[in-house]
């Protein structure tokens, strides 16, 4: 390509490298998901927050640079500034479980909404049991929270970690880590 590529909606980009007219390697297929949170500022205690709203979904490896984790998963929070008031139907937060690496979804996740980034109101939440959290395997799932067409500019996600992995876990006593990927707001 010769110019920057401008992406303004959901689409799939395919890239291939050629040398002397011959394809070198595999074609990279990159599905991009566009929603109200895509490319919006992420505020709060997150240094790599941009990957939460970059439109690129993480793989089944939490180390692929598309998953964001925190130093401590006891309680994490971040706020997405939609830059204008919006009608909000739902928030979807991508989570990964990698049992062998103690990567698990949170015990509790809440969504709070504000018009001014000062006064917030809780609009949705979900809690998960240990059986739902500490499932074996490696898989991705989206936690979807209904927002009932709330109006707001700032959307805050607050998650509480599951604590230590249980005695029956492959990593007993180790803190379960939260890994979030794409936050999608409709």
Stretches found by the model and what they are:
Residues 122-133:
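Solvent-exposed serine/threonine-rich low-complexity stretches and specific carbohydrate-binding patches
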Residues 7, 131-138:
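Short proline/glycine- and polar residue-rich coil/turn motifs
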Residues 1-77, 96:
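Short, compositionally stereotyped local motifs that mark structural "simplifiers"
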Residues 61-124, 139-186:
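Aromatic, loop-rich ligand-recognition surfaces of beta-strand-rich domains
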Residues 45-49, 126-127, 172-174:
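Short intrinsically disordered coil segments
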Residues 9-11, 87, 130:
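Short glycine/proline-enriched coil/turn segments at helix->beta-strand junctions
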């Amino acid at each position: 390509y010769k110019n920057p590529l401008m992406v303004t909606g959901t689409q799939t980009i395919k890239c291939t490298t050629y040398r002397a007219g011959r394809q070198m390697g595999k074609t990279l297929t990159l599905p991009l998901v566009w929603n109200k949170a895509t490319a919006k500022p992420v505020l709060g205690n997150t240094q790599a927050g941009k990957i939460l709203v970059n439109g690129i979904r993480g793989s089944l490896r939490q180390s692929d640079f598309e998953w964001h984790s925190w130093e401590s998963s006891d309680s994490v929070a971040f706020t997405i500034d939609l830059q204008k008031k919006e009608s909000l139907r739902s928030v979807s937060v991508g989570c990964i479980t990698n049992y062998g690496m103690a990567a698990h979804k949170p015990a509790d996740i809440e969504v709070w909404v504000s018009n001014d980034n000062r006064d917030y109101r809780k609009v949705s939440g979900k809690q998960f049991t240990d059986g739902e959290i500490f499932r074996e395997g490696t898989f991705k799932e989206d936690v979807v929270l209904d927002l009932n067409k709330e109006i707001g500019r700032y959307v805050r996600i607050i998650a509480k970690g599951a604590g230590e992995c249980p005695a029956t876990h492959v990593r007993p006593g180790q803190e379960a880590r939260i890994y979030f990927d794409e936050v999608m707001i409709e």
